[in-house]
Curated annotation (Swiss-Prot):
Active-site positions on this chain: 98 (electrophile), 170 (proton acceptor)
Family label: Belongs to the triosephosphate isomerase family.
Location(s), subcellular: Cytoplasm
Keywords per UniProt: Cytoplasm, Gluconeogenesis, Glycolysis, Isomerase
EC number from the UniProt entry: 5.3.1.1
Known function: Involved in the gluconeogenesis. Catalyzes stereospecifically the conversion of dihydroxyacetone phosphate (DHAP) to D-glyceraldehyde-3-phosphate (G3P).
GO biological process: gluconeogenesis; glyceraldehyde-3-phosphate biosynthetic process; glycerol catabolic process; glycolytic process
GO cellular component, one term: cytosol
Name of this chain's protein: Triosephosphate isomerase
Gene Ontology MF terms in the entry: triose-phosphate isomerase activity
Keyword presence, Isomerase: yes
Length: 264
């Protein structure tokens, strides 16, 4: 599949920001932009905001998701939330394996793999996050780390399973600190991710799967990242909290999508 045939997906990850009122106000203000954009716009909101935001934007093209879920359907897991709960609240997708979950809460690939399987089982689109730390990058381990994360997090899945899964490459060293991978460097890793998918599954699936980039994305680097042939979207943290900034990035995404389409 040509890169221009893959959808462009811009995802905002609000992390632990925005009250229900703030989230609803933001989402409603974003709708005029989303409705006319040629790309897909997703937001991973706090758990408390999933249902009210979904009600606020009912029947719109804006896609709402969760930032995490447990691999169990239910049980005595204080403070946890099940995938079926966030889906019932209105989530269409879920972020899994985000670096903050891996490093702050010690989630490993096996646990993330179980979450991915559960998400697929209940009809949530998993956005699988992978990426290396500064130390791993410095020691030349980037590709091995990425390979291991993808292989172990997707273990036991079929090609059919992956048709609704997104991969997000987020170099840990570039998250939330103003640093970001150079577009060419990010492209190299995205291309490598497709190579792994080809080895495990098929060339067809490798060309179809959407791979996002995340890591200090902002209006000054969004276009240069999205111009890369294997970067199909962006996973945005801090820059997604400002309506003005997020709209600018969404509009940039639409421009690049249209540009790539003309090259067919």
């Amino acid at each position: 599949m040509s890169p221009s045939h893959r959808p462009v997906v811009i995802t905002g990850n609000w992390k632990m920001y925005k009250t229900v009122k703030e989230a609803c106000t933001f989402a409603k203000a974003l709708l005029p932009v989303v409705e006319v954009s040629p790309i897909q716009v997703w937001i991973a909101v706090p758990f408390t905001a999933i249902y009210p935001v979904k009600q606020e934007i009912r029947n719109s093209r804006l896609v709402i998701g969760a930032q995490n879920m447990n691999d169990a359907s239910e049980g005595a897991f204080t403070g946890e939330i099940a995938g079926k709960m966030v889906k019932e609240a209105g989530a269409s997708f879920v972020l899994l394996g985000h670096s903050e979950r891996r490093h702050l809460y010690k989630e490993d690939n096996a646990f993330i793999n179980r979450k991915v399987k559960k998400a697929l089982e209940i009809g949530l689109t998993p956005v699988l996050c992978v990426g290396e730390t500064f130390e791993e990058r410095k020691s030349g381990e980037t590709q091995q780390i990425i390979r291991t994360q993808i292989q172990e997090c997707l273990a036991g899945l079929t090609a059919e399973d992956l048709k609704t899964l997104i991969i997000a490459y987020e170099p840990v060293w570039a998250i939330g600190n103003g640093q970001n991978a150079k577009p060419e460097g990010a492209q190299e890793i995205h291309q490598f991710c497709r190579k792994i998918i080809k080895e495990i599954f098929s060339e067809e699936l490798a060309e179809q799967i959407v791979i996002q980039y995340g890591g200090s994305v902002n209006p000054s680097n969004a276009i240069s990242l999205l111009k890369q042939p294997d970067i199909d979207g962006l996973l945005i943290g801090g820059a997604s909290l400002s309506l003005e900034t997020f709209v600018e990035i969404v509009n940039d995404g639409g421009s690049i999508f249209n540009l790539k389409a003309k090259l067919l």
